[in-house]
């Protein structure tokens, strides 16, 4: 019973940390990363379609993304979608290939992005703490129903706290890594 609660809490905490890492990977650094364009949605024959389904995106070099479009007629629509995004990018096309040079980030923009990343990390920490609270509530309910002893409850809560500390540390590590990426010149 307690092991199920701990396993559930661990799984949910892992998912929270993965969601955070996924979220902050979309924040633009000075370095080209294909995941930067993951959020781009293109109108494809009247249906909103993720860019990944219409083209292959690779990092050509440290400051350039290359997009190989599967359907040549979609090139203008993809360019338009990239320009319409709030990423501040200017794509240029040559046939079925679109090149997206990444301009260097200004100091002010870097600081804004760090604020965004810190906010995301705080949401990640809150999520992990909420999962801890849920697990502790379930453990207290077991104690109240006399299904476990007070010693078992204390031990389980200590284990949940260790899990929480571990996952909050992972959130902090992801934040530190992203901040370092943002401050690179």
UniProtKB/Swiss-Prot annotation:
Keywords on record: Cytoplasm, Protein biosynthesis
Pfam entry (one): RRF
Subcellular location per the Swiss-Prot or TrEMBL entry: Cytoplasm
Domain of life from the UniProt record: Bacteria
SUPFAM superfamilies associated with the record: Ribosome recycling factor, RRF
Keyword Cytoplasm annotated: yes
Molecular function in Gene Ontology: ribosomal large subunit binding
Gene3D superfamilies: 3.30.1360.40, Ribosome-recycling factor
Main location class: cytoplasm
InterPro entries: Ribosome_recyc_fac, Ribosome_recyc_fac_dom, RRF_sf
NCBIfam families recorded: frr
Function recorded in the entry: Responsible for the release of ribosomes from messenger RNA at the termination of protein biosynthesis. May increase the efficiency of translation by recycling ribosomes from one round of translation to another.
Record family assignment: Belongs to the RRF family.
Protein name per the record: Ribosome-recycling factor
Species of origin: Photorhabdus laumondii subsp. laumondii (strain DSM 15139 / CIP 105565 / TT01) (Photorhabdus luminescens subsp. laumondii)
């Amino acid at each position: 019973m307690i092991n199920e609660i701990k396993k559930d809490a661990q799984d949910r905490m892992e998912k929270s940390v993965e969601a955070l890492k996924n979220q902050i990977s979309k924040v633009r650094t000075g370095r080209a990363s294909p995941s930067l364009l993951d959020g781009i949605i293109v109108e494809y024959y009247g249906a909103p379609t993720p860019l990944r389904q219409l083209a292959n995106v690779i990092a050509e070099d440290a400051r350039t993304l290359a997009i190989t479009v599967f359907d040549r007629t979609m090139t203008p629509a993809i360019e338009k979608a990239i320009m319409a995004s709030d990423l501040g990018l200017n794509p240029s096309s040559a046939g079925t290939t679109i090149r997206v040079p990444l301009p260097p980030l200004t100091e002010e923009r870097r600081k804004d992005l760090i604020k965004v990343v810190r906010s995301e990390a705080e949401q990640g920490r809150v999520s992990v703490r909420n999962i801890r609270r849920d697990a502790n509530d379930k453990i207290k309910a077991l104690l109240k129903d006399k299904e476990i002893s007070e010693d078992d409850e204390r031990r389980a809560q200590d284990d949940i706290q260790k899990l929480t500390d571990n996952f909050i540390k992972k959130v902090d590590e992801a934040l530190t890594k992203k901040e370092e990426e943002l401050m690179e010149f």
